[in-house]
């Protein structure tokens, strides 16, 4: 019922069609929301449900958890019904929306059937009521099948004319797990708003259509040792056996893979190189999505860039602002109606802010020394960097071969020298936070990205990671 914790904590708060706060909670908890294998969804979900149960109990409102409800139902089955007699039960409705096989009801076999006579959901009374006054009753308008057929034909004719004037586009995908297909379907829906786009699997693609393509978009994963998925083998053989293209079409490629393997996105780069060799024109640089590091975010950013480049290439203007879910965070243009900067009430120091942004432990260090281990005559460069750790309660845990990420900072003297040339500079100890308004929720949401410490830190302390100061 309504007062079972999971109905509120899972369904109401975490369903995509409802409040959908799961990712926001995960970011505030400092979880790696860009990597599904970190199981951040499960951790955030449990935390939300614990908070819901605690808030009800704190205010002395009765609520039950899903484990207690499941055990209570199993006890009800044992005591009320003998073994030879069973009543209908709907497994989908009775099993809680979290914990799965940890609840005993998950393993209970059920049969869902209807015993007659049976009262279904009550129909609308005004549809079945017998009106005493005939003028008040609802009169159904009779529409002939011929009229419906004419309307459908007219609509399809108009749509065909609109699509005929659009640029043809084909979205191809090759996948083993279905991830590439999901992303390709999402991209195809966006392209259909401005192009005459179609979605095909590589094995279903008629390769003779390659000469007539205006825009070819390829979304694929890499399988095995840099090879193609099973449904992309035929396309790969035909493409790499091709010598030239008479029609120099445009194309763009997005590859999916995992950096755990040495041949990361090798198939995508091979297809990109072959199309370029055949003379096709690349619309946007090849994108890469790492399964272990923000694959969805990488695809969203690449898709927006590809759409903008395609619009510019084919001179398409006046189109709607198309975005993927959550892609408003990748928008480069400042929109006062969508973005705002607010003063952070609880300022964070620079190390804490960087740790929260990247969901990793960041330790303050100073550069002690650096030496080039190669000889001056060598064309190679191997630099030994020694870092001196500052005082910090954090324990440094590492293993040989680990990679190191560095967030360099500028000298305070350089920062102060540049700040004096900027008009109306805010206090150097002021923290700002960027907020954006989502298309799904018409409210300002925090990005989780603290504009660390003012103009002093934001513009000058962190700027070397993005560009070079004069």
Curated annotation (Swiss-Prot):
Residues 145-165 are annotated as: Calmodulin-binding. The keyword Iron applies. Produces nitric oxide (NO) which is a messenger molecule with diverse functions throughout the body. In macrophages, NO mediates tumoricidal and bactericidal actions. Also has nitrosylase activity and mediates cysteine S-nitrosylation of cytoplasmic target proteins such COX2. It is an enzyme of class 1 (oxidoreductase). (6R)-L-erythro-5,6,7,8-tetrahydrobiopterin binds at residues 11, 93, 106. Its EC number is 1.14.13.39. GO terms for biological process: nitric oxide biosynthetic process; peptidyl-cysteine S-nitrosylation. NADP(+) binds at residues 380, 440. Residues 169-307 form the Flavodoxin-like domain. It comes from Oncorhynchus mykiss. It is found in: Cytoplasm, Cytosol. Homodimer. Its cofactor is heme b; FAD; FMN; (6R)-L-erythro-5,6,7,8-tetrahydrobiopterin. GO terms for molecular function: calmodulin binding; FMN binding; metal ion binding; nitric-oxide synthase activity. GO terms for cellular component: cytosol. FMN binds at residues 175-177, 179-180, 221-222, 258, 265, 291, 295. This is Nitric oxide synthase, inducible.
């Amino acid at each position: 019922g309504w007062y079972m914790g999971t109905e509120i904590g899972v369904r109401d708060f975490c369903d995509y069609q409802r409040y959908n706060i799961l990712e926001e909670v995960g970011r505030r908890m400092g979880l790696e929301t860009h990597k599904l294998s970190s199981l951040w969804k499960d951790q955030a979900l449990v935390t939300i449900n614990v908070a819901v149960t605690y808030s009800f109990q704190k205010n002395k409102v009765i609520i039950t958890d899903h484990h207690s409800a499941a055990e209570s139902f199993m006890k009800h089955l044992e005591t009320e019904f003998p073994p030879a007699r069973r009543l209908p039960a709907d497994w989908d409705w009775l099993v809680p929306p979290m914990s799965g096989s940890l609840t005993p009801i998950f393993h209970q076999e059920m049969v869902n059937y209807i015993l007659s006579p049976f009262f279904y959901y009550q129909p609308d009374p005004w549809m079945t009521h017998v009106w005493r006054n005939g003028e008040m009753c609802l009169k159904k308008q009779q529409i002939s099948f011929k009229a419906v057929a004419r309307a459908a034909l007219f609509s399809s004719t108009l749509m065909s004319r609109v699509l005929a004037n659009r640029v043809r586009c084909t979205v191809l995908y090759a996948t083993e797990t279905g991830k590439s297909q999901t992303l390709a379907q999402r991209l195809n829906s966006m392209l259909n708003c401005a192009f005459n786009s179609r979605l095909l699997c590589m094995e279903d693609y008629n390769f003779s259509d390659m000469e007539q393509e205006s825009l070819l978009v390829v979304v694929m994963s890499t399988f095995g040792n840099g090879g193609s998925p099973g449904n992309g083998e035929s396309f790969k053989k035909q493409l790499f056996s091709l010598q030239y293209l008479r029609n120099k079409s445009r194309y763009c490629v997005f590859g999916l893979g995992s950096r755990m393997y040495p041949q990361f996105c090798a198939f995508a780069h091979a297809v990109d190189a072959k199309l370029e060799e055949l003379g096709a024109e690349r619309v946007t640089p090849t994108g890469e999505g790492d399964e272990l590091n923000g694959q969805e975010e990488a695809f969203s950013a690449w898709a927006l860039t590809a759409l903008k480049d395609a619009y510019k290439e084919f001179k398409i203007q006046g189109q709607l602002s198309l975005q993927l879910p959550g892609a408003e965070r990748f928008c480069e243009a400042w929109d006062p109606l969508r973005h705002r900067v607010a003063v952070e009430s609880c300022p964070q120091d620079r190390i804490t802010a960087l740790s929260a942004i990247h969901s990793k432990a960041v330790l303050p260090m100073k550069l002690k020394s650096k030496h080039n281990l190669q000889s001056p005559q060598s064309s190679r460069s191997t630099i030994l960097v020694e870092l001196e750790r500052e005082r910090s309660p954090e324990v440094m845990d590492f293993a040989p071969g680990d990679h190191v990420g560095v967030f360099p900072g500028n000298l305070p003297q350089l920062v102060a020298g540049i700040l004096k040339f900027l008009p109306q500079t805010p206090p150097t100890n002021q923290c700002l936070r960027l907020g954006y308004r989502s298309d799904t929720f018409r409210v300002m949401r925090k990005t989780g990205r603290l504009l660390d410490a003012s103009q002093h830190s934001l513009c000058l302390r962190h700027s070397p990671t993005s560009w070079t100061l004069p």
